[in-house]
Amino acid sequence: MATDTASLVLGIETTCDETAAAVVERRSDGSGRILSNIVHSQIEDHAPFGGVVPEIAARAHVDLLDGIIARAMQQAGLGFKDLSGVAAAAGPGLIGGVIVGLTTGKAIALVHDTPLIAVNHLEAHALTPRLTDALQFPYCLFLASGGHTQIVAVLGVGNYVRLGTTVDDAMGEAFDKVAKMLGLPYPGGPQVERAAAAGDAARFAFPRPMLGRADANFSLSGLKTAVRNEASRLSPLEPQDVNDLCAGFQAAALESTADRLHVGLRIFRERFGAPHALVAAGGVAANQAIRGALQQVALAAGTQFMIPPPALCTDNGAMIAWAGAERLALGLTDSLEFAPRARWLLDANVITPAQFANTRAGF
């Protein structure tokens, strides 16, 4: 049963390499307030390996999560009995970490007789803009992270239609792989952005993948390969070579992304009418160059551009708590038997077009 009363929800996030917990208030008018938001990044643990090691991540979640939840509750000035619900990210993500967070959420819910909300990590990103702004449905979401690159029509809580997706590398994944091949430290995305700012984007004629296609899908694998080929040709690389390669790669990725979003917004209008906004979410949305490109896309499309603060674009507990609060307001709770999921489609009824059946577009 739906309720219009205010709620206090604890959110737990452990799907990748951030161990996070937060408490969020959802008021009866639908507005939100963050009471606490504690995030521990495991970057230093994974940096020697050049990427996230699932076993290390899961063990760190086990070691850290209880203390982080305690800090989140203390900062919010609440006890567990004050909570209206406990929201835990139940996927998609690295299954070891997902199990840690969801099991902890279940334990709290069971001991304190509090409703459990098993949150789709992607839905949490999709709904985060409504935590920080008075945003009404429907809106067009560009979700870009290390594991996902999607254009999604957000029609309501639990109601999502994917308009476009990557058929190979996610955008964050491509940025990280380019950084690694150029010898830049982990995490690679911010390093590529920093190097690109000092580079000449016009030095290399990199391809613009999928440009001009009628569908709104993405592909970055070929662009990544083009960067690798140029880097091999120039080896050994001088610092300016690295800067120029990063600038050329980022410019090509942004031009392709802008084109894909123009198409995605057109498809959105044809199917659902005008969106209330173009919204960006996910860790890649913290990139300032990407933010600028998206702002121009929204301007050209005649719609407003909205994006959460950078701290709410990357993985955090507040987004999980908020998604839980949004679902709780509609009376949507979950059984303690809910199973963790390594893969969990945001749009569960999607049918992958035949030409993309053997690509990552199906996930």
Curated annotation (Swiss-Prot):
Q: Which residues bind substrate?
A: 143-147, 176, 189, 287
Q: Which gene encodes it?
A: tsaD
GO CC term (a single one): cytoplasm
Going by the record, the broad EC class of this enzyme is transferase
The yes or no answer to whether the keyword tRNA processing is present is yes
Q: What is this protein called?
A: tRNA N6-adenosine threonylcarbamoyltransferase
Q: Tell me the superkingdom of the source.
A: Bacteria
Requisite cofactors: Fe(2+)
Q: Which cysteines are joined by disulfide bonds?
A: none
Determine if Transferase is one of this entry's keywords: yes
| Recorded family membership | Belongs to the KAE1 / TsaD family.
Tell me the residue numbers annotated for binding Fe cation.
Answer: 121, 125, 315
Which Enzyme Commission number(s) are listed? 2.3.1.234
Record field: catalytic activity = L-threonylcarbamoyladenylate + adenosine(37) in tRNA = N(6)-L-threonylcarbamoyladenosine(37) in tRNA + AMP + H(+)
Briefly state the protein's biological role: Required for the formation of a threonylcarbamoyl group on adenosine at position 37 (t(6)A37) in tRNAs that read codons beginning with adenine. Is involved in the transfer of the threonylcarbamoyl moiety of threonylcarbamoyl-AMP (TC-AMP) to the N6 group of A37, together with TsaE and TsaB. TsaD likely plays a direct catalytic role in this reaction.
Q: Which residues form the signal peptide?
A: none
